[in-house]
Structure formats: C-alpha cells, structure tokens
C-alpha cells in the first residue's frame, strides 16, 4: 500500500489529538520540546505512524501496532532526515528505547552510550563522538602535559553571573588547568553566541581556563527527551545516567580528575544530579566538589534570579548579581530583544 506522509501544523488540533492517542497506545507520550511533527495516513486518512524533531534530534517515533512490520518506521525516519537536511542539520541524534537500537543501527545511526535495558543515545555520524573527543584533546595537548591537576565545569550561563564567575575562579585557583564546557544548545533566553561572549569576557582574567562547546553531546535537563519515561524523576535519572557516561569518557580523554558544581538546595533537579555525581564520579576516579553558591544579602546568586530581576526591571539588583561585562551587555541595544522576551514570558525560572 502507498501511504502518504505530511507535516502536522501546531494548529491542527484534531491530528495532534490523534497522534497523542497513537503515542499513548504504543506506550509513549508527546515530548514537550518539538519543532516539527509529521504523520503517515492510510487510505481513510487515519494516522498510522508519526515522528517529530527538535533541533537536530529525532523524537516521538512510533508506528501503530496494526501496521508494524510494513517498513513504515523506515519511511518516517527517512522523511525526518530529509527535513533536517533541508534545514542544514547534517549531524543528527536520537534517544531510543534499548530494544529499538538495533533497528536504528540498520538505518545508519551509531551508538554513543547506553543505559542497559533503558535508553540508547545515538548519532548518524560514524565515530562522531570520538572525533569530538579528538578535537578536545588536540586543542589542549601542550597545556595538558604541564598540568598535573585538571578540573572541569559544565555550565549554561543564561546569563553569566557573579555566581558562575565565583565557581570558575575557585576551580582555577585550586587546579592547574580547568576545562569549562558551555552548553551549545540554543534554547535559552540568551542565545548561544551571546552566552559564549559573556563567558569569555567573564573569564578573560583566568589564563588556565579553557572554554569548550559541548556540541550536542551534553544537553540540559530542560531539553532531554521525556516521551518514553514514566514520570519526571525517571526522566531526570535517565538524563543523569546518559550525561555522566558522556562526561566520564570526556574526562578520561582529557585527564580530568575533578568536577566542580554549585550547590542549589532549592532545586529538585540539582539535588538529584549532585547526589548522583557524588556517587558515580568517584567510581571513575573523579572527585565531585560541590561548592556553596556565592550569596548576596544571604541569597544565592543564580541566573534565574537575574532573569526574574530583568522581568521586574530591577536594574539595581541585576548590577549586584552580574559582572560588569554582563551588565554592560544588558544595557546595550543588542540585549533589547532578549530583555523584551524575558519580560513578556510567564515563566523565567527553571524546574
């Protein structure tokens, strides 16, 4: 049979409702983060298969159990890959159930890491992650040989605050070399290029800190796919397990012995993440150092506090929370669209 595949618009509530039911029937749910969705229709215009994208990832792929074995998933994936290629995304990623990894391998996807009996993280570029590790290593080869104490931090910096600066300065003072990994995904209020420039300005005085892009290998909890997880805590645990496997391979490549993280007693996600790092990282010879956050007037400095202050137009408070370089940017015309977006948003804090 010849089935048709078409794009589903966000306004097509009937089709989206049918997709939701199909996903539920097959044991998954629609992910919170999608920017393209397609569906396959039978001769009576019933939706029998679906798939979606978010940035350069494939998500929410499923075929009705009544039509499995007909090669429909292959057609859905091919359609999504073509959509991604048209958008200039040649390096694609997906997270799939453990039992489905073999199928995606047959379509050219390579395993990066896996959580046994749960999730497999895959990419369509052969040895892509190994090439990323090689790129990291070549960038610091000369410096690393002279650095017996090597540490790392992973940050989003949305935007870069005095809290971030304090944590980086502490790591820089206590180690010979510090690798700072900045989340590359562009899904924050402050775009990737802006965050990178603010970080560079904020660490310019630290000669032993090397800034790296995370590429698509390290992503935030906010955009980790949740569609085949039973609840939010399961999503968090899966993200942590994948993320720490990625990080420990990076650490082994770069000789990283310590990872610095900021404490955040009011964040459920951060508490779970920090506990997992304290347990898992030492198994790989990496010390997890949790640092009490820098405070002002007894309150911890965080990027979410800065965003809230921007929303409230409290510039005096903002000036006390960020380095001068960040504040200067916020006062510039280039920041106007970002500030407007934050001020118009209902929610500017993280989970």
Where are these regions (language model features)?
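Conserved beta-strand in the GNAT
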Residues: 39, 45-62
């Amino acid at each position: 049979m010849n089935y048709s595949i078409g794009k589903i618009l966000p306004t097509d509530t009937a089709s989206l409702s049918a997709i939701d039911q199909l996903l539920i029937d097959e044991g998954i749910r629609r992910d919170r983060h999608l920017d393209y969705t397609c569906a396959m229709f039978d001769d009576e215009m019933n939706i029998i298969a679906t798939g979606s994208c978010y940035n350069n990832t494939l998500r929410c792929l499923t075929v009705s159990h009544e039509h499995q074995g007909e090669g429909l998933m292959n057609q859905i994936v091919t359609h999504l890959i073509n959509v991604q290629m048209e958008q200039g995304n040649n390096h694609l990623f997906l997270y799939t159930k453990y039992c489905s990894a073999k199928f995606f391998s047959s379509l050219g996807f390579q395993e990066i890491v896996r959580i046994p009996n749960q999730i497999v993280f895959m990419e369509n570029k052969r040895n892509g992650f190994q090439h990323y590790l090689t790129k990291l290593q070549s960038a610091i080869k000369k410096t690393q040989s002279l650095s017996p104490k090597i540490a790392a931090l992973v940050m989003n910096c949305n935007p870069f605050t005095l809290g971030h600066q304090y944590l980086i300065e502490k790591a820089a003072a206590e180690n010979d070399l510090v690798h700072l990994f900045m989340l590359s995904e562009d899904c924050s209020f402050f775009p990737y290029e802006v965050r990178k420039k603010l970080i560079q300005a904020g660490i310019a005085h630290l000669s032993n800190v090397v800034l790296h892009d995370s590429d698509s290998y390290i992503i935030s909890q906010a955009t980790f796919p949740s569609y085949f997880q039973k609840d939010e805590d399961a999503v968090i645990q899966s993200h942590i397990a994948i993320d720490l496997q990625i990080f420990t391979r990076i650490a082994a490549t770069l000789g990283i012995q310590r990872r610095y993280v900021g404490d955040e007693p009011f964040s459920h996600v951060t508490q779970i993440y920090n506990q997992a790092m304290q347990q898992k990282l030492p198994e790989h010879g990496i010390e997890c150092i949790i640092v009490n956050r820098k405070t002002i007037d007894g309150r911890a400095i965080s990027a979410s506090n800065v965003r809230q202050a921007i929303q409230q137009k409290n510039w005096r408070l903002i000036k006390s929370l960020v380095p001068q370089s960040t504040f200067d940017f916020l006062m510039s015309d280039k920041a106007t669209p970002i500030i407007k977006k934050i001020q118009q948003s209902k929610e500017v804090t993280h989970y």
